[in-house]
Amino acid sequence: MQPCFFRDGKFYKLLPELGTIEINGVKMHQTVQRMPQEDAENKVNTLGVRKGENVLDVCTGLGYSAIAAAERGAKVTTIEVDENVLELAKQTPTSKKLFENPLIKIIVGDALQEVNEFDDGEFDAVLHDPPRFSFAGELYSLVFYHELFRVLKKGGRLFHYTGKPGEKRGKGIRAGVARRLAEAGFNKIEWNEETLGFTAVK
């Protein structure tokens, strides 16, 4: 496979020098303030992943968050809906451990559906790093947040990346996200400026 291709109505391009990919011209990782791997490390640190924990990683991408969590000794289940993204990950040297670390289990499927298969309280922590709201609004829905709440153990932690889309135009999503997380049952919902996401606790 070439590092760029058109498939399933989308144009995919691997940008190895930046450690990211583009889908329809949109970069899937933070590349301005820091490189994607460092960004993933920061998210995992913010979540407080520890050795022996069971972690759910929603939206695998190139696998940096799953790798970072597994390298801390956590058992990671990671979900990716787009097989084309995983094919690009196999061509990315920095993603090699995603396919080699025995602590990582990859599920190919729609997270909205796959999360229903997990038991109540199955995970110690959830790292939810979805595409932009305009691309995958269902992963920002109250229905999905209810499921993330359900699969977390009591006292379990959530990190939810959102970024700050639309805020310059007065159409930000953060207030709505925080409100729906609270409606789903989460407590201690706090914004983390460094990682551009919310932390919350069950």
Question: Whereabouts are the PLM-identified features?
Answer:
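S-adenosyl-L-methionine
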Residues: 81-119
